[in-house]
Swiss-Prot record:
Its main location: nucleus. InterPro entries: H1/H5, Histone_H1/H5_H15, WH-like_DNA-bd_sf, WH_DNA-bd_sf. This is Histone H1E. Residues 50-124 form the H15 domain. CDD domains: H15. Histones H1 are necessary for the condensation of nucleosome chains into higher-order structures. It comes from Chironomus tentans. Residues 210-237 have a biased composition (Basic residues). Residues 1-56, 109-237 are annotated as: Disordered. GO terms for molecular function: double-stranded DNA binding; nucleosomal DNA binding; structural constituent of chromatin.
Length: 237
């Protein structure tokens, strides 16, 4: 029999443990971030400018300064800043653009320099760029005339409704007018009688026949005078 001490139990191998890298921890997957809902707030409207247009401010500066050699860009900037109380540095590019365009059009004269630098002045007959205000429309006097015409038309229309009655009156008067017309026809027939009585008066003209008697009396006087003169001449011898 073998001794129990001699029998050595074989060691039991342990299961291999999975080795994990030191310092590295497995990260859990991140949940996707919820998108923030966009707020539908209305955009604020841009504030209206409290100053007039750049063109008006520049022209006003040049006309007010009245410099003989023209107003420079620096002088225009100072005037605009003092008069209108605006941030001139923001308006400088617009002022330069207006000056160049005005010189090209001829609304401004460049006394010195080139481009936006130099001095500028208005031409002698140039007018301000200010837009003329529209005059209020004056009421036209013609509006009173149509009222009178409409009144006259109404007056004319009223007797037009009574025309049928006038026609009846004229129809009734026609037979009476025929009777009256028959009476002057009888008078016309009687009128020729006095004309026939007047004809014999024209035929009586006995005065014209007395003229030949005077002509017969003249030759009777002449032969009686001639024989009396001849014997008187013989006695004178």
């Amino acid at each position: 029999m073998s001794d129990p001490a001699q029998e050595v139990e074989a060691p039991v191998e342990a299961a291999p443990v999975a080795s994990s890298p030191k310092g590295k921890k497995e990260k859990a997957p991140k949940a996707p971030k919820a998108e923030k809902p966009k707020s539908d707030k209305p955009k604020k409207p841009k504030a209206a400018p409290t100053h007039p247009p750049v063109s008006e401010m520049v022209v006003n500066a040049i006309t007010t300064l009245k410099e003989r050699g023209g107003s420079s860009l620096i002088a225009i900037k100072k005037f605009v800043a003092a008069q209108y109380k605006v941030d001139v540095e923001k308006l400088v590019p617009f002022i330069k653009k207006f000056l160049k365009a005005s010189v090209a059009k001829g609304t401004l004269l460049q006394a010195k320099g080139k481009g936006a630098s130099g001095s500028f002045k208005l031409p002698p007959a140039a007018k301000k760029v200010d837009k003329p205000k529209k005059a209020p429309a004056t009421p036209k006097p013609k509006s009173t005339k149509p009222k009178r015409v409409t009144g006259e038309k109404k007056v004319v229309k009223k007797p037009a409704a009574k025309k049928p009655e006038a026609k009846k009156a004229t129809k009734a008067a026609k037979p009476a007018a025929k009777k009256v017309a028959a009476k002057p026809a009888a008078k016309k027939a009687a009128a020729p009688k006095p004309k026939a009585a007047a004809k014999p008066k024209k035929e009586v003209k006995p005065k014209k026949e007395a003229k030949p008697k005077k002509a017969a009396a003249k030759p009777a006087k002449k032969p009686a005078a001639k024989p009396a003169k001849k014997p008187a001449a013989k006695k004178a011898k």
